[in-house]
Amino acid sequence: THRGTLFPYTTLFRSPIFDDTKRWLDIYFEGDVPNFTPLLCPEGTHFRQQVWNYLLQIPYGKTTTYGALAKKMAEHLQKQKMSAQAIGGAVGHNPIPIIIPCHRVIGTNGTMTGYASGIWRKEFLLELESKK
């Protein structure tokens, strides 16, 4: 254990979940494809969680559009159609970016849109993945 100086009575501990997440991020930022997904328990509405599950299915180094995700979700929910804006709202509320790869979703015309951490980071992540 370690006692911090700001909170001297707080004990920090190691967690397998944090260790797995760190290992996943280390592999990812070395430019390799992690062959596992750390335990994820994001909180959100049922709809958002469904969208985030679709994000996890986008292959490393590939992209999809908000419109394509909307079409998949409409089929999944047995609806005639769904708006790309609804999908964008769920993607924008992704609480675990990078691991849940919202950076792999682009505009219909190929534009880099809607990344809360900045478009330059989205471009960086896609460039990193394109090298593999």
Where in this protein do the model-derived segments appear?
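Basic nucleic-acid-binding alpha-helical/helix-turn surface characteristic of O6-alkylguanine DNA
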Residues: 10-78, 130-132
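…primarily DNA-binding HTH/wHTH and HhH modules…
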Residues: 108-132
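Major-groove DNA-recognition helix of helix-turn-helix-type DNA-binding domains
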Residues: 91, 99
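Single conserved hydrophobic/aromatic residue that forms the stacking wall/gate
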Residues: 1-11
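Short, positively charged loop/turn segments that connect secondary-structure elements
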Residues: 74-88
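Residue-level signal for inorganic ion chemistry
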Residues: 55, 69, 102-103, 125
